[in-house]
């Protein structure tokens, strides 16, 4: 999957993956990470997610990474946030008091840009990658996240042959097999959410499961 795919989606505003409200699973499970209020939280492939506003409201310093510049600009403008922009070697750094977003490729994001990170939140990043690219993303996430950082991961799983992603199906088996090298994994919840997702119902997907994980970066 090439960057042009996502740029075209944002240019056409075909952004069905964007939620118009804070993710209820974030609200329900975030406190289980037991973070200090001033913790810095990394949000990969953040888009213009309102989840970042929720995290900032908890007192966190939010650090996002997003490929598409329009998505970043819309986040700040739609939330009436004044921002500064700094040009870096590989990214543009958009900044306001509690939310900083690096606009550019996550694979070229330097770990030196996030030395204070102690937590992360992935709702739409892991499931955005087809299987042949997903492991490379997981390895990059592990590279960026300091040891002992804690994170909340939300995944979707369904019969991949029944629907073309994104979002792509990520099974519990895949999570356990491919993330356990770098993270301690605890599945907090797993629910049938087919009836809540009309696109999947319309495409006659036979089942759809949403899972929530608590991850801790190994030392």
UniProtKB/Swiss-Prot annotation:
- Catalytic reactions on record: S-adenosyl-L-methionine + a thiopurine = S-adenosyl-L-homocysteine + a thiopurine S-methylether
Q: Where does S-adenosyl-L-methionine bind?
A: 10, 45, 66, 123
Q: Which keywords are on file for this protein?
A: Cytoplasm, Methyltransferase, S-adenosyl-L-methionine, Transferase
Question: Where does this protein chiefly localize?
Answer: cytoplasm
Say if the entry is tagged with keyword S-adenosyl-L-methionine.
Answer: yes
Q: Where in the cell is it found?
A: Cytoplasm
Could you say which EC number(s) this protein's record lists?
2.1.1.67
PROSITE patterns to which the protein is assigned, alphabetical: SAM_MT_TPMT (PS51585)
Q: Which PANTHER family does this one have? A: THIOPURINE S-METHYLTRANSFERASE
Return the protein name: Thiopurine S-methyltransferase
Q: Name the source organism.
A: Shewanella halifaxensis (strain HAW-EB4)
Lineage at the top is: Bacteria, Pseudomonadati, Pseudomonadota, Gammaproteobacteria, Alteromonadales
Could you tell me the gene encoding this protein?
Answer: tpm
């Amino acid at each position: 999957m090439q960057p042009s795919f996502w740029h075209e989606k944002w240019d056409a505003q075909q952004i069905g993956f964007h939620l118009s409200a804070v993710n209820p699973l974030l609200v329900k499970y975030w406190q289980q990470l037991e973070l200090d209020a001033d913790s810095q939280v990394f949000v990969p492939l953040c888009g213009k997610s309102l989840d970042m506003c929720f995290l900032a409201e908890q007192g966190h310093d939010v650090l996002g990474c997003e490929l598409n510049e329009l998505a970043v600009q819309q986040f700040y403008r739609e939330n009436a946030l004044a921002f500064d922009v700094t040009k870096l070697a590989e990214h543009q750094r958009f900044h306001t008091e509690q939310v900083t977003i690096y606009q550019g490729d996550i694979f070229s994001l330097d770990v030196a840009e996030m030395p204070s990170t102690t937590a992360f939140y992935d709702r739409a990043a892991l499931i955005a990658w087809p299987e042949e690219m997903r492991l490379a993303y997981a390895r990059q996430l592990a590279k960026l996240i300091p040891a002992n950082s804690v994170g909340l991961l939300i995944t979707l799983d369904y019969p991949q042959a029944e629907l073309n992603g994104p979002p792509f199906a990520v099974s519990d088996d895949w999570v356990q097999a491919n993330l356990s090298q770098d993270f301690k994994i605890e599945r907090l919840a797993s629910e049938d959410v087919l009836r809540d997702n009309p696109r999947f119902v319309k495409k006659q997907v036979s089942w759809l499961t949403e899972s929530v994980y608590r991850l801790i970066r190994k030392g």
